[in-house]
């Protein structure tokens, strides 16, 4: 299957290159704490040199995908912990970094945001979080692990929305992932399909024909290994109509049965988009999980 034509790819890359400086400057201004009149600036500051593109290509069979992302370097020295954020449906990777990049300051860790295939400025199609999303997450982890400024044993993965599905499938397949945050995801597509509202079904049909085989391949619960030695934080809104709370509760139970250390944070009045509430819960989890060497991503 032809994913992208050469002319389209070159045009998009040219546009991305022309706008790269502006995007990095915009992200840097947010991280600098630049504010309006009468507001107190942030006590700590990052220059634009701390924000760099984190883009790469990943191949799956005959298809090749270009992955868009950004990396925010913490001002700390040495090999630091890191968090990889798998973004999907919450804007592009630049917006992800604007929202979460400040963790480089507040937690003293490296922050990488990528858009999984089919989202943001990453090439697609997504095909309902197909195998290409997991392949992109695998490669991103390997790239981070190879960096001299990252402790390869202290890397966490944080998936948001459909990115949580990709993160969960990565957890199913890669025993190196020791700490994972799953936010607002749908983890049992086999059960979700008959319960999903018409709008959600139409969105799924637009991406892929939802046969039982396809739904099982993309269901985190259906692909869980017999045992898991990882820490998992599940964050979810009780009023989420795109991914019902029962999806998160069912996954939490399945993970505990397999030996995972699971904690949950459910917001009774929240829907699919959790905003600052999710960042606060995730920050607490990351601080504890990556505080000491030897936790996060096994070598």
Role assignments for model-derived ranges:
Residues 128-148:
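Alpha/beta-hydrolase active-site loop
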Residues 143-149, 153-196:
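Primarily recognizes the serine-hydrolase "nucleophile elbow" in alpha/beta-hydrolase
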Residues 249, 253-299:
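C-terminal catalytic histidine-bearing segment of alpha/beta-hydrolase fold enzymes
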Residues 41-76:
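N-terminal cap/lid segment of alpha/beta-hydrolase-fold proteins
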Residues 91-102, 116, 246:
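The serine-hydrolase catalytic nucleophile loop
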Residues 228, 234-236, 240:
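Short beta-strand/loop motif that positions the catalytic acidic residue
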Residues 106-123:
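Conserved alpha/beta-hydrolase
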Residues 185-223:
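Mobile cap/lid helix-loop segments that gate and shape the active-site cleft of serine hydrolases
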């Amino acid at each position: 299957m032809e994913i992208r034509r050469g002319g389209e790819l070159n045009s998009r890359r040219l546009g991305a290159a022309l706008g790269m400086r502006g995007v990095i400057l915009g992200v840097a201004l947010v991280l600098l704490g630049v504010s309006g009149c009468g507001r107190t600036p942030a006590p700590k500051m990052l220059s634009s040199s701390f924000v760099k593109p984190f883009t790469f290509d990943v191949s799956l069979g005959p298809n090749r995908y270009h992955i868009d992302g950004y990396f925010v370097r913490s001002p700390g020295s040495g090999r630091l912990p890191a968090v990889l954020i798998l973004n999907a449906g919450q804007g592009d990777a630049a917006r992800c970094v604007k929202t979460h990049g400040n963790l480089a300051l507040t937690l003293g860790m490296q922050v990488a945001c990528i858009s999984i295939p089919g989202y943001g400025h990453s090439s697609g199609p997504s095909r309902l979080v197909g195998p290409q999303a997991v392949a992109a997450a695998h490669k991103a982890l390997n790239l981070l692990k190879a960096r001299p400024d990252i402790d390869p044993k202290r890397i966490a993965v944080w998936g948001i929305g459909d990115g949580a599905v990709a993160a969960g499938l990565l957890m199913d397949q890669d025993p190196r992932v020791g700490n994972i945050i799953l936010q607002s995801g749908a983890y049992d597509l086999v059960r979700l399909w008959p319960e999903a509202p018409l709008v959600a079904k139409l969105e799924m049909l637009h991406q892929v024909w939802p046969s039982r085989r396809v739904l099982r391949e993309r269901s985190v619960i259906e692909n869980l290994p017999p045992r898991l030695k990882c820490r998992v934080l599940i964050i979810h809104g009780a009023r989420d109509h795109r991914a019902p709370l029962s999806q998160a509760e069912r996954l939490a139970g399945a993970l505990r049965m397999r030996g995972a250390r699971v904690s949950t944070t459910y917001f009774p009045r929240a829907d699919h988009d959790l905003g600052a509430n999710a960042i606060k819960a995730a920050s607490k989890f990351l601080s504890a999980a990556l505080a000491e060497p030897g936790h996060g991503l096994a070598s």
